[in-house]
From Swiss-Prot:
Gene3D superfamilies to which the protein is assigned, alphabetical: 3.90.940.10
Summary of subunit composition and partner proteins: The RNAP catalytic core consists of 2 alpha, 1 beta, 1 beta' and 1 omega subunit. When a sigma factor is associated with the core the holoenzyme is formed, which can initiate transcription.
Protein name: DNA-directed RNA polymerase subunit omega
Signal peptide start-end: none
Organism: Mycobacterium tuberculosis (strain ATCC 25618 / H37Rv)
Keyword entries, A-Z: DNA-directed RNA polymerase, Nucleotidyltransferase, Transcription, Transferase
MF (Gene Ontology): bacterial-type RNA polymerase core enzyme binding; DNA binding; DNA-directed RNA polymerase activity
Function description: Promotes RNA polymerase assembly. Latches the N- and C-terminal regions of the beta' subunit thereby facilitating its interaction with the beta and alpha subunits.
A single GO BP: DNA-templated transcription initiation
Reaction(s) catalysed by this chain's protein: RNA(n) + a ribonucleoside 5'-triphosphate = RNA(n+1) + diphosphate
Domain of life: Bacteria
Family from the record: Belongs to the RNA polymerase subunit omega family.
HAMAP family the record matches: RNApol_bact_RpoZ (MF_00366)
GO cellular component: a single term: cytosol
């Protein structure tokens, strides 16, 4: 059986070590960002339900997005991020970090 040139180039790629959860080692993996950082359990402590958290974060993310869109027009109707945004960080991630840091006041039902 002969190996084609494209298959040979694939065969030449060294294998990547697989993560073994039984080893107890966590090396090689970065701390996840976004919905898992801040932890969802800590976010749920700040609202009455997971549904309230979704609405709360979505409203704030929309405000942040509108703020960025209006910067070029010179209209500053919305408040920008209250935490230092990371490079290419999404508005929802920023909103969740603001909620986690207790930087916002929210009344449910509004």
């Amino acid at each position: 059986m002969s190996i084609s040139q494209s298959d040979a180039s694939l065969a030449a790629v060294p294998a990547v070590d697989q993560f073994d959860p039984s080893s107890g080692a966590s090396g090689g993996y970065d701390t996840p960002l976004g919905i898992t950082n801040p932890p969802i359990d800590e976010l749920l402590d700040r609202v009455s339900s997971k549904y309230a958290l979704v609405i709360y974060a979505a409203k704030r993310a929309r405000q942040i997005n509108d703020y960025y869109n209006q910067l070029g027009e010179g209209i500053l109707e919305y408040v920008g991020p209250l935490v230092e945004p990371g490079l290419q960080e999404k508005p929802l991630s920023i909103a969740l970090r603001e909620i986690h840091a207790d930087l916002l006041e929210h009344t449910e039902g509004e």
